[in-house]
């Protein structure tokens, strides 16, 4: 009798497991959330300042966590020798990039530029593979420094723009990088989500509009990495994942 009971119990358990499996499959098959769901989450994440509460190794890192995951995947595939960051702030993202690059295991340097390092975390300053430069990112001297680093660390480049978000400044940054980036290099223009794309409507022309203006002038410079941009449903860099042609 005990053996029969255990057999029936086992069969019931298997049936319940099968029903759950079918229900799970059906949910995945028939539930197709609209883009509006992702947009609402985007607005929630931004509007509640979740991005300002994000840290890396205890250092503030004002980023979308899904974007950061995307960046490490890009770095792993691209295997650049030079990472360029315009906009240092606390230094968390620069340290993050350096740690990822060390795992890739080839000689590299991270150059991060900001017009003020007053907010820079002292722990970030101890990072040996990051070069912190206090300057406007559009100063011609920055282009000269990038060229020197290219000579010292030949190979692919990953660049990310996250400093002054005004259209004219971002456009100037993109133009400064134009002669420095080669085919296959990667550029991310962050915060193109502001000015109603979909957050902070009324901000005024910003990174999104800078990308459009750049592409009007130089339509063949970049192709858009739509797969990366859309991978996690939303990004702080819409229209801003760019691969140099």
Swiss-Prot record:
Gene Ontology terms, MF aspect: methyltransferase activity
Keyword Manganese: no
One of the record's GO cellular component terms: plasma membrane
Any one of the GO BP annotations: DIM/DIP cell wall layer assembly
Domain of life: Bacteria
Enzyme Commission (EC) number: 2.1.1.-
Keywords assigned by UniProt, alphabetized: Lipid biosynthesis, Lipid metabolism, Methyltransferase, Signal, Transferase
Signal sequence range: 1-38
Pfam family name, one: RMNT_CmcI
InterPro entries for the chain: RhmsylMtase (IPR054932), RNMT_CmcI (IPR007072), SAM-dependent_MTases_sf (IPR029063)
NCBIfam families: RhmsylMtase (NF045824)
General remark: Was identified as a high-confidence drug target.
Family: Belongs to the rhamnosyl O-methyltransferase family.
Protein name: Rhamnosyl O-methyltransferase
């Amino acid at each position: 009798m005990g053996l029969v009971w255990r057999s029936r119990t086992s069969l019931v358990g298997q049936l319940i497991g099968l029903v759950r499996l079918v229900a799970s499959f059906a949910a995945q098959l028939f539930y197709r959330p609209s883009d509006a769901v992702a947009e609402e989450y985007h607005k929630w994440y931004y509007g509640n300042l979740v991005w300002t509460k994000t840290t890396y190794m205890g250092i503030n890192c004002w980023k979308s966590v899904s974007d950061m995951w995307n960046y490490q995947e890009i770095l792993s595939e691209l295997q650049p020798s030079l990472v360029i960051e315009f906009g240092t702030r606390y230094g968390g993202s620069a340290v993050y990039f350096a740690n990822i690059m060390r795992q890739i295991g080839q000689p590299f340097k991270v150059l991060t530029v900001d017009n003020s390092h007053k907010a820079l975390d002292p722990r970030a300053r101890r990072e040996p593979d990051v070069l912190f430069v206090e300057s406007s990112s559009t100063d011609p001297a920055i282009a000269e420094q990038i060229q020197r680093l290219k000579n010292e660390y030949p190979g692919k480049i990953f660049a990310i723009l996250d400093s002054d978000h005004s259209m004219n400044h971002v456009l100037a940054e993109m133009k400064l990088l134009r002669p420095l980036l080669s085919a296959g290099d990667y550029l991310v223009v962050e915060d193109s989500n502001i000015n109603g794309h979909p957050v902070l409507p009324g901000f005024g022309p910003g990174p999104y509009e800078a990308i459009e203006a750049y592409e009007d002038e130089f339509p063949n410079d970049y192709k858009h990495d739509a797969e990366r941009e859309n991978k996690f449903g939303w990004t702080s860099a819409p229209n801003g994942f760019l691969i140099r042609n």
